[in-house]
Amino acid sequence: MSPTERPRIEGDRELEILAATLEVLGDVGYDRLTMDAVAARAKASKATLYRRWTNKLSLVIDALHHSKGPAHVPDTGTLRGDLMELVCGMGGLADPETVAPFASVLTAIARDADFAEAFRTEVVGPKVAASQQIWERARQRGEVRGDADLSLFEPALAGIVLHRVFVMGEQPTPDLITRVIDQIILPAATRQPAPSH
């Protein structure tokens, strides 16, 4: 039975459990996260957790999905505005609560095929779909050159920002995201490629 088919926990209690899950994930990583640890952090019984989530995979994926916010596709009328709203809004890369557990997520993706599949489908999938819509609308408005391979542009912004955060040690601020959009993404998407020799 999937998490969406299981009974909901009343009131804010479910949100508290999901927040505790992200805290434990950030503290100990996915491999060492247990339902016991989440229950203790959330001051809940394990039975409460198991009534809603079948295992730690379903709990962690639900917590990550919830932290990303609803699958909203911004439509500001410009590619720049849409990218800023998508990446800097709730659940975006400028949200410290979203980025904090990400190191644990990257490790889990590399080590656990079931986690990787669930993460790509449930957590990343809605953001990828939103990004695809944004880029396709930009192409239809003439903001992106016609020969641009949108499948390369869609993940580029997140890839650059996450590299700067996890490899270079920078904070994922709206200023960093603005600079990446204005100095890398938009020029690359609009500039004509150099002729090949």
What kind of feature is each model-predicted range?
Residues 92-100, 104, 114-140:
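Amphipathic alpha-helical packing segments from all-alpha helical-bundle domains
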Residues 71-100:
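Hydrophobic alpha-helical connector segments
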Residues 1-43, 47, 58:
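Basic, helix-initiating cap at the start of DNA-binding domains
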Residues 10-13, 124, 146-154, 173, ...:
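Short amphipathic alpha-helix in the helical subdomain of ABC transporter nucleotide-binding domains
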Residues 17, 32, 55-60, 67-71, ...:
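Short amphipathic alpha-helical segment with a characteristic S/N-K-E followed by hydrophobic residues
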Residues 88-94, 102-111, 181-188:
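Helix-loop "lid/cap" segments that line or gate small-molecule binding pockets
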